[in-house]
Design a protein with these regions (language model features):
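Acidic, low-complexity, intrinsically disordered peripheral segments
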Residues: 30, 216, 409-434
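Sec/SRP-type N-terminal targeting helices
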Residues: 44-48, 61-65, 69, 86, ...
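Periplasmic alpha-helical coiled-coil/stalk elements that build and connect Gram-negative outer-membrane
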Residues: 130-247, 359, 363, 405, ...
Length: 434
């Protein structure tokens, strides 16, 4: 029989093996987060919304400035019942206007648009957080899948070695045909598990590649010091929930964006109320022209026809059919919606933090339990080997014990990366990955 201690040592050596030298294009977690910030389509869309908000601010500011326009009007006309000929008229002019007073609507609108721009910038930061969270999930999933694949590869190699060894024993008449067939069946099952593990790695890598917006023909590997962590005891202690909650609320761009949006909505309500305000406008105009189809006095017409004017207009709204009242009501509804959104997002954050914190604590305990389970299954396999050699244990029971060890190793891997992911997400919510 193959020495079981040697098998166990080889199994763990291969399962824990991490390639030291990767091909060109190796990515750390920090590299992935930077690439996602640079290339994410979601972030690109958010930045475009920022640009749109910036343009709105500029438009709001320019609306309070003077306007100047020039005009050139060419007219061809006739009097069919008076003169039997066509006449030509040319009018030239330049005019300008400036709003002296609009009840403060323009300045309020500028303030509102500025706040909206600030809220949009914070919303972009929240989108960045969301992208980072997706990258973290994909990155840790790929690490876990890769480690499970190494476990599956080790299992296949050991099962192949055992099958080859059993083939020799069968030829020597030391084991039965049944034992050899079971060994072959075990090898096929391990190869099937290996294919499943390969598919998981491929799926996880595709997910991460798409988040990083890399071409599908780009080959890349990931590397992380997390693969060498053996126990949660070697990690920093989790913060208290109160500290986590305080840090997360202070560092959450989404809450800040909602808070600024509420202020912007309040300004919009004030702007809507200015619809019935008196408006004072200063205007100026300068114009000239000429007429007649044929004339030698074009120059004189332009000269003596020149006219300048200045006007002061005062608009006093009296009845607007309820338009201003409707705009105020709509603005108040939007303001209330912004306040409700802020409260809902705050509750959502609290719920997410509570779940995430409990998951992190639970994952640490599951990780420790999985370590003990692997140790227990390893000892059980040593005993099973001794019983098998003594003829007190069937090969089927021996295979069951080997499979239990492999399952325990997979459980350990999943628990490990679940814990690491939970901790990274806590850091993300605390703003430590910005």
């Amino acid at each position: 029989m193959i020495n079981t201690k040697v098998l166990i040592n080889a199994f763990f050596a291969m399962a824990a093996f991490t390639t030291a030298v990767f091909a060109e294009g190796t990515w750390t977690l920090e590299d992935c987060l930077k690439q996602a910030k640079k290339s994410s389509l979601k972030l690109e869309s958010a930045k475009l919304r920022e640009q749109s908000a910036d343009i709105s601010v500029k438009q709001a500011k320019s609306s309070g400035g003077p306007t100047v326009s020039a005009s050139i009007q060419n007219t061809l006309y006739d009097h069919p019942f008076v003169y039997n000929e066509d006449h030509y008229r040319l009018n030239l002019g330049i005019s300008g206007s400036y709003t002296l007073w609009d009840g403060g609507a323009t300045s309020l609108n500028v303030e509102s648009k500025t706040l909206t721009k600030e809220a949009t910038a914070l919303a972009t930061q929240q989108t960045e957080r969301s992208v980072q969270e997706s990258v973290l999930n994909a990155y840790m999933s790929l690490l876990a899948a890769s480690e499970n694949l190494r476990t599956a590869d080790a299992s296949v190699e050991l099962a192949q070695a055992e099958f080859d060894h059993y083939g020799k024993l069968y030829e020597a008449g030391s084991i039965t045909k049944k034992d050899l067939t079971q060994s072959q069946s075990n090898l096929l099952q391990k190869q099937t598990s290996q294919l499943t593990a390969q598919l998981s790695v491929s799926t996880a890598k595709t997910t991460l590649r798409q988040l990083l917006e890399l071409d599908d023909n780009v080959e890349f590997q990931i590397t992380a010091p997390e693969t060498n962590i053996e126990s949660p005891d070697s990690l920093e202690a989790l913060p208290t929930y109160e500290q986590l909650k305080a840090d997360a609320q202070n560092a959450h761009p989404g809450l800040k964006s909602d808070s600024v949006s509420v202020r912007a909505a309040q300004k919009n309500t004030e702007v809507a109320g200015k619809g019935n305000s008196i408006t004072v406008t200063l205007g100026a105009n300068s114009s000239t022209g000429l007429q007649a189809w044929q004339s030698k006095a074009y120059k004189d017409q332009l000269k003596y026809g020149w006219q300048n004017s200045i006007t002061l207009g005062i608009n006093i709204p009296i009845i607007d059919g309820g338009a201003t009242a409707s705009k105020v009501l709509q603005a108040q509804v939007s303001e209330t919606e912004s306040q409700v959104s802020l409260k809902e997002d705050l509750k959502t954050l609290e719920n997410n933090l509570e779940k995430l914190y409990l998951n992190a604590m639970s994952a640490d305990m599951q990780w420790k339990a999985a370590i003990l389970q692997v140790q227990a299954e390893s000892e059980a396999l040593v005993v099973a080997e001794e019983q098998r050699n003594a003829g007190a244990l069937t090969y089927t029971d021996f295979l069951t014990q080997k499979n239990n060890l492999e399952k325990a190793q997979i459980t350990l891997t999943n628990a490990k990366y679940t814990s690491l992911l939970s901790r990274k997400l806590l850091e993300l919510y605390q703003g430590k990955l910005d």
